[in-house]
């Protein structure tokens, strides 16, 4: 048993000094606030947390956490997070991804991270659209979804 005492943290300890750059009213603010509020309850040092993201609105997340983080390339956060976890098994590694990043371009990496059953935490922001481009439908968009990129709606029949 270690004699080193884990510091007591608050939500404020996990807030970075970076200005949050999401659109007004975006649900990502609530996810960030709740994550920052929850991190102290794990009873771990801040240095034990690593947040790994890909591309998209959700992927700015590591900048807003006062912890270690990587902003990787599109869809590859699960692969990078797997490497972090293999090299540092005692860390609490978090994949931060969106429905476009994690289920479309990174779908294969997401699936293999699940298949490997590694001790990763995956926080998937599902807004059912590519939010950063503000108009492309994502893998979780509703059938018939009208966007700037699909003004006549998403039709699986017409795609096939």
Where are these regions (language model features)?
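Active-site diphosphate/adenylate-binding microenvironment
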Residues: 12-73
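Class I SAM-dependent methyltransferase SAM-binding "motif I" and its flanking Rossmann-like core
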Residues: 130, 134-137, 143-154
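Conserved small/polar residues in nucleotide/adenosyl-binding loops
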Residues: 157-160
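Thiamine diphosphate
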Residues: 57-131
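A short, structure-level motif marking secondary-structure boundaries and short turns
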Residues: 7, 20-21, 66, 93-95, ...
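Short secondary-structure transition/capping segments
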Residues: 93-101, 139-148
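Glycine- and other small-residue-rich loops at beta-strand/loop junctions that grip anionic moieties
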Residues: 24, 99, 153
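Cofactor-/ligand-binding subdomain signature composed of acidic, glycine-rich
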Residues: 1-15
């Amino acid at each position: 048993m270690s004699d080193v005492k884990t510091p007591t943290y608050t939500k404020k300890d996990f807030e970075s000094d970076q200005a949050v750059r999401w659109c007004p009213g975006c649900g990502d603010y609530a996810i960030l606030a709740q994550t920052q509020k929850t991190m102290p309850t794990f009873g771990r040092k801040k240095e034990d947390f690593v947040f790994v993201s890909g591309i998209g609105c959700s992927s700015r997340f590591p900048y807003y956490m006062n912890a270690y983080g990587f902003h990787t390339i599109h869809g590859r956060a699960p692969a990078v997070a797997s490497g972090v976890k293999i090299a540092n098994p005692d860390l609490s590694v978090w994949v931060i991804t969106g429905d476009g990043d994690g289920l479309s371009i990174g779908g294969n990496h997401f699936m293999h991270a699940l298949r490997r059953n590694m001790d990763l935490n995956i926080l998937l922001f599902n807004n059912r659209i590519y939010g950063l481009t503000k108009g492309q439908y994502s893998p979780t968009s509703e059938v018939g979804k009208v966007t700037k990129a699909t003004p006549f709606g998403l039709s699986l029949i017409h795609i096939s």
